[in-house]
Amino acid sequence: MRASPCISQPAASWHPRPSALRPTAGSGPDTRTPGTVEDGSAPCPAFRSPAVSPCGEEPCCFQISPAEETLELGRLVSPGNCDTLSPRAAGFYACHVRSLIPCRSTKGRWPLTASAAGLSSFSG
């Protein structure tokens, strides 16, 4: 039995490829349009608290909340994994394919903290 994707988005045009799930920072100029499904990106609503639905085995979306916390499955992870829109402009952030990794692979790999203060070192 397959679990549903974490994100509540129509998945008709969102097909992350396994080869695209690896980090690609610095691979070249970024010509994508945040908030669209072009080139495998998908818009994600910003979570306002860590209380998000648990995830199955589908790829999950990382997003940064208005409090500048990066949330994934209700846990805080490195904000370096997200491409963001202006938090005040549309109220949501764009998570691209490179920010989507299988849920199980995050276990024990990312720094967890209870507040955004612990993530300040990642802002650069």
UniProtKB/Swiss-Prot annotation:
Residues 1-42 are annotated as: Disordered. It is found in: Cytoplasm; Nucleus. The keyword Zinc does not apply. Its main location: cytoplasm. Induction: By p53/TP53. It comes from the Eukaryota. Strongly expressed in testis. Weakly expressed in heart, placenta and skeletal muscle. GO terms for cellular component: cytoplasm; nucleus. The keyword Cytoplasm applies. May play a significant role in p53/TP53-mediating signaling pathway. This is TP53-target gene 3 protein. The gene is TP53TG3.
